Amino acid sequence: MSGRLLDAVPLSSLTGVGAAQSSKLAKIGLHTVQDLLLHLPLRYEDRTHLYPIAELLPGVYATVEGEVLNSNITFGGRRMMTCQISDGTGILTMRFFNFNAAMKNSLATGRRVLAYGEAKRGKYGAEMIHPEYRVQGDMSTPELQETLTPVYPTTEGIKQATLRKLTDQALELLETCAISELLPPELAQGMMSLPEALRTLHRPPPSLQLSELESGKHPAQQRLILEELLAHNLSMLALRAGAQRYHALPLGANDTLKNQLLASLPFKPTGAQARVTAEIEHDMALDVPMMRLVQGDVGSGKTLVAALAALRAIVHGKQVALMAPTELLAEQHANNFRNWFEPLGIEVGWLAGKQKGKARQAQQEAIASGEVQMIVGTHAIFQEQVQFNGLALVIIDEQHRFGVHQRLALWEKGQQQGFHPHQLIMTATPIPRTLAMTAYADLDTSIIDELPPGRTPVTTVAIPDTRRSDIIDRVRNACTHEGRQAYWVCTLIEESDLLEAQAAEATWEELKLALPELNIGLVHGRMKPAEKQAVMQAFKQGEMHLLVATTVIEVGVDVPNSSLMIIENPERLGLAQLHQLRGRVGRGAVASHCVLLYKSPLSKTAQKRLQVLRDSNDGFVIAQKDLEIRGPGELLGTRQTGNAEFKVADLLRDQAMIPDVQRIARHIHERYPLQAQALIERWMPETERYSN
């Protein structure tokens, strides 16, 4: 096997990897020995020294040694084995819920045991639940680990011990086989070599302290972080270059419809809206597909900008598709566009997952014939049976609910006669610059950084649920004496439409009893679109005082007379989502308030997050704080959307590297195309690559 490249050596060549194990390893993206070596530890455990039992603190992971005092099996609510050990300084209880007779026999009274686990405070003092343990021989000194112990990302059926044994074999192969050096020589010089970095991170030497690795600043980590960030940037550059090779239909200046729409509006667009519209129109006049991200804070008027872009395509006789993440938001867009476009003689169509039978078929036929020029909907728009007729512009609202792959699917779908549609992505969740530079590096960015005149900042307060009756009085006062309208938003931890609907219904019933003088509406995700629309319309027209809702009203609802919002359990939502919700009030000239009605006690993190909302109404400031508190994965929504997760890099911790990474990535992309592609393939599974 000497001299072979490790990306060509299958894991099945390692001892202990048969067909069943291969299948399990493939589930976590491990196929070759190189994949295994790049499957880096999530964290490390320090098992190099003993802790006296008396000094154990809750939450500390520690190795202890002691003599077994007793072991018992109990049959209470759940079958359990407990074993108490003592080291002379104190007593530790080990609890096991999964055990067998051999374990019970091995933990006989008088035996010496070495155990590792997380210390907790139990009923009878310190305890560990399911610690790893080893029965010691008669040796007077315990057999401790000499180096830090790696803990790997794993999946069902693959134990840590298995991954450690396989990694040992992979590291041995690193002595006789090669792993390609993909960094240009001028960059690799002076850095730790790749084999040395991998050895260090999989099996840290005894001299290496845990604190060094936790900081992410060790040279071995920096070497791999650089490679991984480069791979992601190169993937974006490849996507960008790929798009530039495609042709789009140039849509030159023709402002007939645009001028008609602007003349019909009761307001004048802001300077920022005009500037961003000009940037979009410039891109759409080119013969390469526009790929532009429009960021705008809540209420900045992105929908009008999207409408003006749509008119540029429609005036040329082409179709436009707008995709929104939820049916309610898609309905809202459809209504807005109908109000604006139907007086101009433009047919607006609507497609969503809930449409069935003849209505759906009729809509699809109208789209395929070109009768409908503006199509609004959810992801149902890019299902196979939907055929377009001259699709020239794709607008995607709330980008990071979809992810790169879904927007590429819609883009590919629009290809006709060798032309790809222009693409406009809108997000009301401002993206911190660090993330925009990595996750959206394939897009040009426009920012609508000006709110329409007459908007007033929302005052936000956090109040414990124990003062619920005071808040109900406040709602009564706002709705009866001040003539205002209010929202009451219910949130749930579970991602369940049914449970959310039940919670909202219960709150609705409670508030109807407490506020009989008010007309109170209810809207949630399980209602039929027509029902939701009827309630929203009644609220918008002032027929209801108070609207009880789930987070379905997060985006797109515009009721200028509403000036008070109560958000229950705000600690369950991210800052960006709370900021979105809050954006439903403060849309008129009157002073508006948002009450964060939380359950005590709040964790320190939750306190910090709610304080950010009280301090700021600026979406970009809030997004940066959200990044610092929650981390990039949650902020970008990558848990759901399949955007890339990182193996060793951390966008928050490593943000200072991003400008250098971008510069180096451009250099490699231009000068070393083969290495660029190899870096992408090394670090990014096919499902996560951005390139087509």
Where do the model's predicted regions map?
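Structural detector for short beta-strands of small beta-barrel domains
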Residues: 58-79, 117
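C-terminal accessory region of SF2 helicases/translocases
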Residues: 589, 601-692
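Short boundary/loop segments of OB/S1/cold-shock single-stranded nucleic-acid-binding domains
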Residues: 42-62
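N-terminal pre-P-loop "Q-motif" helix
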Residues: 267-290, 304
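Inter-lobe coupling/hinge segments of SF2-like helicase ATPases
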Residues: 275, 289-611, 667, 671-675, ...
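Long, highly charged, low-complexity intrinsically disordered interaction regions
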Residues: 1-14, 23-26, 232, 242
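Upstream accessory/linker segments immediately N-terminal to the RecA-like ATPase cores of bacterial MutS
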Residues: 74-264, 638, 671
